[in-house]
Regions:
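Short, positively charged and aromatic/hydrophobic N-terminal segments
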Residues: 2, 19, 54, 59, ...
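Residue-identity detector for glycine
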Residues: 22-23, 28-32, 49, 58
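Short hydrophobic targeting helices and cationic amphipathic motifs
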Residues: 43, 47, 51-53, 60
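Structured-RNA-binding interfaces characteristic of tRNA pseudouridine synthases
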Residues: 63, 75-325
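Cationic, low-complexity basic patches in intrinsically disordered or flexible, solvent-exposed regions
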Residues: 26, 35-38, 45, 57, ...
Length: 325
């Protein structure tokens, strides 16, 4: 991909054995009688070999006599944009989610922190960082996926090292790879998986309290599993979301798995995509059923708008586990 905003025009007068073009490295043309067309072909072939740029040549004037050949031309230089995919692990406790849109846009988001470091690393402005799944306030990620375009020639290893050196300690880049230009972290995702972690004990763990939801009694796992079946498949999740202005609120839930014992429990939910707060509201509803605050029949009533959804689950126990492509 070429970034037309960063193209530069050069106007060059060239004679038989040049040393530099615009201060760049020697192209290596040797003496001898060559036509302007052959010289042009040589320049294209050799400059593109030595520099991470793509040249576009236009001959303005040329002449050839016994003693010398001269070629006056202009070329346009495009910086080649690379597409970089990164995998990110983060503790979302102190952030306002992956990103915030509109008037409430905040710098205290995961994406803002990464974009700030990317700008310093590349010297580029207005970097667009696409993510696989926008996590909400306080939600964590084991493997968020994002991509961005850059003309930097840093290796993927150097990019990873730079980001991990300058990002906050609660954000880590676990993998960096160069991908085809058409890859888009959000548009190419085929499924997204969240996992909700809970502990069940009389005294909450001091070390787990910020990253798991604590229950003082064990929810009815069997009742939750039966209720979870009502979410499987394609439904209009408008009433299980806070995204009231979304035009398309139909999503397909592939799987909900509830497992664990009397001390720890996890809820895994996989779907093609999630509306804003959809995962939290589904999990919150299942917990209400597990604690006897609702019946599974309420799920159908909420879908139909006959009843209102309850409170979303506490975000501190929710993790984006995987984005599949």
């Amino acid at each position: 991909m070429y970034n037309s905003e960063n193209c530069i025009f050069y106007y060059i007068s060239w004679e038989m054995t040049p040393t530099f073009i615009g201060g760049k490295k020697q192209a290596g043309i040797s003496g001898g009688s060559q036509s302007p067309q052959l010289m042009e072909a040589f320049l294209k072939r050799n400059l593109n070999r030595h520099f991470y740029y793509m040249m576009e040549f236009v001959i303005l004037k040329s002449y050839n006599d016994r003693d010398k050949i001269s070629l006056q031309f202009k070329y346009r230089e495009y910086k080649i944009m690379r597409n970089i995919k990164i995998t990110i692990e983060y503790d979302g406790s102190r952030y306002q989610g992956w990103t915030r849109l509109g008037k409430d846009e905040s710098n205290n988001t995961i994406s803002a922190k990464i974009i700030d470091v990317l700008g310093k690393m590349t010297g580029e402005k207005n970097i667009e960082l696409n993510c696989g799944c926008r996590t909400e306030v306080g939600v964590h990620a084991y493997a968020q996926v994002a991509n961005f375009k850059t003309s930097s020639n840093l290796s993927t290893k150097d990019i990873q090292h730079y980001l991990n050196r300058y990002l906050p300690m609660d954000i880590a880049i676990t993998e960096v790879e160069e991908v085809p230009d058409r890859f888009h972290a959000q548009l190419n995702a085929v499924s997204k998986t969240y996992v909700y972690r809970m502990t069940i004990m009389d005294v909450p763990s001091v070390f787990e309290r910020k990253h798991t939801y604590h229950c003082f009694k064990t929810p009815d796992k069997k009742a939750m599993q039966q209720a979870a079946l009502l979410f499987i498949g394609e439904h209009d999740f408008r009433n299980f979301s806070t995204a009231k202005k979304s035009k398309n609120t139909t999503r397909e839930v592939y799987d909900i798995d509830i497992y664990g014992d009397n001390e720890e429990m996890q809820i895994l939910i996989q779907a093609d995509d999630f509306l804003h707060n959809m995962a939290r509201l589904i999990i919150g509803t299942l917990l209400d059923i597990g604690f006897g605050l609702r019946k599974k029949e309420d799920i159908e009533a909420i879908f139909n708008g006959e009843k209102t959804v309850g409170n979303p689950c506490d975000p501190k126990g929710l993790y984006l586990q995987e984005v599949e492509y």
